[in-house]
């Protein structure tokens, strides 16, 4: 199959995040490219507001995989900033507790969306018959996509550090080196996800959808919560 270089170049004012994906021209790697583009756009969209209470303007049709990817990265962006806020040493304890509970709910919502992405893949591959020697991956495709979403946020924020005019040259240089590593990681992860999807489609690997057991949110499995009910 003919190989190609797919380039996405984004800047803070227009589009942002620089990544080069070396892959093959097939539908699976096009999906990975779509993830990168949507995550980059959504990260930028959040930072137009830079407010954890902002209401997103989702441009995608409800129920589509694009819609799920947008909502996934939006939740990640909001939670990123909630984690920043809760680490303020001067935060009011009452506010911190409320925020911690909000973060717990966000984690559950995030997990639910990841499982929605895995359900999409499971339905996509339902007619694929795995080969006799097919193997399973250490993580499902959606949890790898989850890491790709977080990487988009890391790259954005590290790029902001590189652009700071109030920082020392040493800080800018250090962050520039970290940014280069993050971009390399994004390229490698994108390639790995594409290869995993190709292997699943070819029956070389198979996947399972494990429903995550968030025990701390469940009144039946969190001992502190179920003790209250006795």
Whereabouts are the PLM-identified features?
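Anionic, Ser/Thr-rich low-complexity intrinsically disordered regions
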Residues: 28-230
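Short, positively charged and aromatic/hydrophobic N-terminal segments
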Residues: 7, 13-16, 20
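Cationic, amphipathic, low-complexity segments that mediate targeting or membrane/lipid association
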Residues: 2-5
């Amino acid at each position: 199959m003919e190989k190609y270089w797919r380039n996405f170049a984004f800047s803070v004012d227009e589009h942002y995040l620089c990544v080069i994906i070396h892959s093959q021209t097939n539908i699976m790697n096009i999906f990975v490219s779509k993830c990168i583009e949507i995550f980059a756009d959504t990260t930028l969209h959040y930072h137009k507001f830079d407010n954890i209470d902002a209401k997103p303007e989702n441009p995608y049709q409800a129920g589509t995989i694009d819609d799920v990817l947008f909502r996934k990265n939006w939740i990640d962006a909001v939670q990123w900033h909630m984690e920043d806020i809760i680490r303020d040493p001067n935060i009011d304890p009452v506010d911190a507790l409320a925020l911690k509970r909000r973060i717990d709910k966000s984690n559950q919502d995030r997990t639910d969306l990841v499982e929605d992405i895995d359900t999409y893949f499971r339905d996509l591959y339902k007619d694929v018959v795995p080969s006799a020697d097919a193997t399973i991956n250490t993580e499902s495709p959606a949890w790898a996509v989850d890491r790709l979403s977080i990487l988009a946020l890391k790259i954005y924020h590290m790029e902001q550090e590189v652009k700071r005019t109030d920082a020392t040259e040493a800080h800018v240089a250090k962050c520039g080196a970290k940014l280069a590593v993050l971009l390399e990681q994004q390229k490698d992860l994108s390639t790995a996800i594409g290869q995993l999807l190709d292997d699943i489609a070819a029956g070389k690997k198979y996947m399972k959808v494990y429903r995550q057991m968030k025990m701390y949110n469940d009144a039946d499995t969190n001992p502190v919560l179920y003790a209250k009910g006795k």
